[in-house]
Amino acid sequence: MFDKTKKIYVSDVTLRDGMHAIRHQYSLEQAVRIARALDVAGVDSIEVAHGDGLQGSSFNYGFGAHTDLEWIAAVADVLKHAKVATLLLPGIGTIHDLKQAYEAGARIVRVATHCTEADISKQHIEYARHLGMDTVGFLMMSHMTTPRHLAEQAMRMESYGAQCVYVVDSGGALNMYDVADRFKAFRDVLKPETQTGMHAHHNLSLGVANSIVALEHGCDRIDASLTGMGAGAGNAPLEVFIATADRMGLNHGCDVKTLIDAAEDIVRPLQERPVRVDRETLALGYAGVYSSFLRHTEVAAQRYGLSAFDILIELGKRRMVGGQEDMIVDVALDLLQRRDARGAGAH
């Protein structure tokens, strides 16, 4: 059942996950305009970073138009209500990067690991608490392990000092029952004061539904983005989620019309590739592939004359996870070899 008096913590990810949709190319002016609208609308936090987190700007993930610190400082400078959040993936970002992000204005950090690798977050979570940051554990690709094992990983993050732990559906592969099971498992083992969060992707068109089910099972924080701006088919669209929550009489604290206008007038025109469910983004959810593989896969498909759908399905079969972007080309070359072998056999 829903507690309609409980305030939903609304966490916007347009300026972090949304980076993937435009290959990390937001200008400072665009970032500030989006942040201002979100702040006026009443969201609680605005995550700002390269799509792959602090120091994600690289050959492997793609170079950003600006540094993380430039984006963070620009956004922090204009906010009156919302707090600046950022993302850190241990192994990409370091505690030194986190300290600089804090100095630039970030006050919340989500420390993200693969769903079975919470142990690598210890140093970063402890340091974030030392800085006095609101510290969140972020268990990516949560569909790839059982609810019980995911809850055990959440307990580890909690033991390191995480004040909130997220179910992160990076592949957009979870359905409502999967989400319910994971939040039930979290509540069974986490301390009552430890908050929980839901980060949905819309690859099976379930981003909003999964977020609502998470709330039904005690979730405290919901990630969403304007127009769903994010990797793959995007995240739960913020304006749709808030409109739904509003119709249900839930306490969200946001202005629906301001979000709808910002989505349509500011964010949608920036999309060079529509953020939607289509053949390729559906393949992500269907095969359970990391959503940010989408743009890299489409480049490889074009280069080698292959179907992006076929590459994504094969990546899913091989259970590739975030950080293995280099395997996209390997898979493409294997598919090319198979195709050539079939062609040779036909003669």
From Swiss-Prot:
Family matches, as InterPro entries: 2-IPM_HCS-like, 4OH_2_O-val_aldolase, Aldolase_TIM, DmpG_comm, DRE_TIM_HOA, PYR_CT
Listed Gene3D superfamilies: 1.10.8.60, Aldolase class I (3.20.20.70)
Active site: H20
Record-level Gene Ontology MF annotations: 2-isopropylmalate synthase activity; 4-hydroxy-2-oxovalerate aldolase activity; manganese ion binding
Binding residue positions for substrate: R16, D17, S170, H199, Y290
Reactions performed catalytically: (S)-4-hydroxy-2-oxopentanoate = acetaldehyde + pyruvate
Database matches in PROSITE patterns: PYR_CT
Residues under site feature: Transition state stabilizer: R16
Protein's UniProt name: 4-hydroxy-2-oxovalerate aldolase 1
